[in-house]
């Protein structure tokens, strides 16, 4: 599905339209749809499949995305891929929030002070190992 970014992705402020493609229940891909010499193509992960994950969406983001009780909200975190997938890093401090009801999206920058259990370079393997131990 295509989304219009109402608040930019950090480092990609020139991109305002993206396509979100699901790879599987855990991973998705975000691809820029804006004509630009600096294209965006990143892997995202569903944070709720990895860990306990909860944060407050700031009021200004709620307003920008026109969120209400009927909105279908999807949240993803950016994955920095490494050669070995389990060595990849997840940024839990800058989630991407999408309202699939109206096609709006935004990135939220969370404070480490408010969310000390979230990191911006958490290794994917630590969550994969935890999941294996639970099974």
Swiss-Prot record:
SUPFAM superfamilies reported for this sequence: BH3618-like
Predominant location category: cytoplasm
Location relative to the cell: Cytoplasm
Cellular-component GO terms for this entry: cytoplasm
Biological processes, Gene Ontology terms: bacterial-type flagellum assembly; regulation of translation
Swiss-Prot/TrEMBL keywords: Bacterial flagellum biogenesis, Chaperone, Cytoplasm, Translation regulation
Coiled coil, from the record: none
Database matches in Pfam families: FliW
Subunit structure: Interacts with translational regulator CsrA and flagellin(s).
Family membership noted in the UniProt record: Belongs to the FliW family.
Function per UniProt: Acts as an anti-CsrA protein, binds CsrA and prevents it from repressing translation of its target genes, one of which is flagellin. Binds to flagellin and participates in the assembly of the flagellum.
Name this protein carries in UniProt: Flagellar assembly factor FliW
Organism of derivation: Helicobacter pylori (strain G27)
């Amino acid at each position: 599905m295509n989304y219009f970014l109402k608040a930019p992705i950090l480092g990609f402020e020139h991109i305002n339209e993206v396509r979100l493609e699901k790879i599987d229940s855990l991973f998705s891909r975000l691809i820029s749809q804006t004509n630009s010499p600096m294209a965006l193509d990143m892997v995202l992960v569903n944070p709720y499949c990895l860990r306990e994950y909860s944060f407050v969406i700031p009021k200004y983001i709620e307003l920008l995305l026109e969120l209400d009780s009927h909105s279908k909200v999807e949240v993803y975190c950016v994955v920095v891929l490494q050669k070995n997938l389990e060595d990849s890093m997840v940024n839990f401090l800058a989630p991407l929030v999408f309202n699939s009801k109206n096609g709006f999206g935004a990135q939220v920058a969370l404070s480490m002070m408010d969310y000390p259990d979230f990191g911006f370079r958490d290794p994917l393997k630590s969550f994969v190992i935890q999941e294996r131990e639970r099974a």
